Amino acid sequence: MADECAAFMKGTELPVKRPREEEAETEMEAANNSNNGCEKEESSPYISSVLPGWFSEISPLWPGEAHSLKVEKILFQGKSDYQNVLVFQSSTYGKVLVLDGVIQLTERDECAYQEMITHLPLCSIPNPKKVLVIGGGDGGVLREVSRHSSVEQIDICEIDKMVVEVAKQFFPDVAVGYEDPRVNLHIGDGVAFLKNVPAGTYDAVIVDSSDPIGPAQELFEKPFFESIAKALRPGGVVSTQAESIWLHMHIIEEIVANCRQIFKGSVNYAWTTVPTYPSGMIGFMLCSTEGPAVDFKNPINPIDDESPAKSIEPLKFYNSEIHQASFCLPSFAKRVIETKGK
């Protein structure tokens, strides 16, 4: 899924979620030297030097603003082969997972992302059986896929083993999806994994990816979408994160144009609110391959009232009404998305 707060090590393969560009190494040094109110062994380069005791995310992807959360306690810090991993207890959003200085999820609002990126595609097709997750090492998407009793096989390819281990330790209610016996975990590069998938294998592919910068750029380009289309059966569906209409319409235009060239079934944009993501929202591309028609805007496959996994809590965010509403776009975004690539 590099950041603007510090020039940290970048992975060369598939990252998890939303890494940022390298920027301002001096901010890291200043933060290290500041008195942030935490114990010495709990200090972090991402604790703000301006607001001691607060975590601050400053990004070129949301210029002119910053997002800060008050830190009650730093629970974990580590460096994997690909990124820096931080977990802290916040005052208002519960535990927070941060990769390379970028918030990936919080206990309070993760449901809005995990539930929507998963159920928008899976509730739009009848009886999905084989599902592939690219990225998503925290296990949240797995948790949501496991609610669907028709699913027989859930494959996940995550590049960073540390993210999986940290999620299981500090976010058990998110990582609970790993307990499902249908799950097959592959540690490795998701792009390479997808290239080796036999044609027509999956009913659905869910891409829990990073932003289209740096090494993740290829996840939003034609070759990657072509690999997804090849891996899907006729009438199969893909769901992938697609940035913010408030900040990234130029990126969304390119994604929509690429998808319309590759996916001959349907191409749609939906969105949800996530307070700790840039601009407080994030979008998804929902596409289908040529074959049985898929009407993403009208769900046909309701989630079981009782999940096969009894340890999973009831849905917090998703329902059929919000499913339909998520495809309603502001006029400025609707004009661009409906005309791009046609």
From Swiss-Prot:
Family from the record: Belongs to the spermidine/spermine synthase family.
Residues that, per the record, bind putrescine: 113, 208-211, 277
An annotated GO cellular component: cytosol
Annotated GO MF terms: spermidine synthase activity
Source organism superkingdom: Eukaryota
A single GO BP: spermidine biosynthetic process
Region (Disordered): 9-42
Keywords: Polyamine biosynthesis, Spermidine biosynthesis, Transferase
PANTHER family xrefs: SPERMIDINE SYNTHASE, SPERMIDINE/SPERMINE SYNTHASE
NCBIfam families linked: PRK00811.1, speE
Protein name, entry field: Spermidine synthase
InterPro entries attached to this UniProt entry: PABS (IPR030374), PABS_CS (IPR030373), SAM-dependent_MTases_sf (IPR029063), Spermi_synthase (IPR001045), Spermi_synthase_euk (IPR030668), Spermidine_synt_N (IPR035246), Spermidine_synt_N_sf (IPR037163)
Protein source organism: Solanum lycopersicum
Residues given in the record as S-adenosyl 3-(methylsulfanyl)propylamine binding sites: 83, 114, 138, 158, 189-190, 208
One Pfam family of this chain: Spermine_synth
Catalytic residues identified in the record: 208 (proton acceptor)
EC number: 2.5.1.16
Pathway: Amine and polyamine biosynthesis; spermidine biosynthesis; spermidine from putrescine: step 1/1
